[in-house]
């Protein structure tokens, strides 16, 4: 996996200083209240200097949401097949009205911004979010802080951040978060580069599916037959693209000709978010993008869109240049804003994302806010699917609270309760859990009701009593939810056929399956599936093959990305067991069964 700067960023995930997230009223200093604070520069970054005061930077401010509990219950009701409101998704307008903050909240924050010269006219208001661009000089006064340029020691990339920010006392009760400020970490594609290699195959003929995976292997293993999704604008398949990864049309076309000739002529749209480019002739690595489109579309045949979101490229030397703001985006937030602003008719039905990062490396408020935004997509009928990660029980394996406690590391957003997390398997006859499949238990998000019985059974009956006590949170959201093949997928990239491994393969594979299931439901005048998890853990569970062999590993003593020394935990693993487990979830899809269950 690599960072949003296209290089390994594991160094910044080890020993990241503790993030102290306080309620806005917890700290007071000269009429300012501290919102968020780091206790030092995160490991893997060095402070370089100060940006020019005139440097422009775009900020997104999250207002305190007064209806969080009500909204979360609404999402669960809409997604629960046993509830009367199942499938009654909210429109863009209904969601906006439901979450709209009071005039008092907005006025208080607008008045504070205006006091520093940021007029209401220059602020874009979007439900409970405000977006504005201002100079570093103004931002430093506004947030009572100093911004600095920080360089990543692994790849040389630079970002502008601060270690602490505050808001005026008059606005403090109404401000939940402002970014980009304290978030240094960056998501990575969930690819295991160790298993990337050239392949000498030109079609699915005579392929040993125990050695190499092709679309035909998946169709046979998961009993998909020759079923594809109808090209229906109500069932658009969305694929997330970051890191200047460009999905190349010529590679995709060749892949389809080689492995899915029945879909000859199939293509996908490209949508640019925050100025993302669509470089079809780039020499940069695009393995992740290729893998995603090859298998999500190659399996489903669905009407598809690749959503490219501009990442944080290297800063140019002259920080006065106007495009400096492009290098400080928070890609998840940018993508979520774009999608949630789409009319209902343009929103994807399924969104597949193969990126993640250590949960503890993300500021707590940031992870909470972003997870809630994924919930908003669910409320509007979008199935949000994430790869679980490629670090097994963990790679850094220590806390970032200053104590350096040895522990397993859950992955974000895979551990967000509003997304469907997909772990990895390999082999057929039998299919087994793959060693790098990330899983475990969130330290931020409580275990949701839909998986309570399954996770409680695992902890009480399948996990040896006392095993790994203190290494994980037994009350946290368990992940992954399901699993799929993840080893040596035949993929086309830059004119070559290569074998690629990782849960980056599992997520688009499962997204393709969900797209076909949506198509079946729509053909029977039923709504699309939306947020999947309540259905998966109830009606859908009998449509999965339980994986009971294999397990994950991790905590090997060397970080797999930075190669720095880390705690060694002998035998660290989650085993695949009967029922749900934190390496393969409920198991792998049996399409033949699922296609019937979705009509119940």
Curated annotation (Swiss-Prot):
Binds 1 Ca(2+) ion per subunit. It comes from the Eukaryota. Residues 1-22 form the signal peptide. It catalyses: Release of an N-terminal tripeptide from a polypeptide. Its main location: secreted. Residues 212-600 form the Peptidase S53 domain. Gene3D superfamilies: Peptidase S8/S53 domain (3.40.50.200). Its EC number is 3.4.14.10. The active site is at residues 288, 292, 504. Its cofactor is Ca(2+). Disulfide bonds: none annotated. Keywords: Calcium, Glycoprotein, Hydrolase, Metal-binding, Protease, Secreted, Serine protease, Signal, Virulence, Zymogen. GO terms for molecular function: metal ion binding; serine-type endopeptidase activity; tripeptidyl-peptidase activity. GO terms for biological process: proteolysis. It is found in: Secreted, Extracellular space. Glycans are attached at residues 210, 281, 323, 404, 575. Ca(2+) binds at residues 546-547, 579, 581. Secreted tripeptidyl-peptidase which degrades proteins at acidic pHs and is involved in virulence. This is Probable tripeptidyl-peptidase SED4. The gene is SED4.
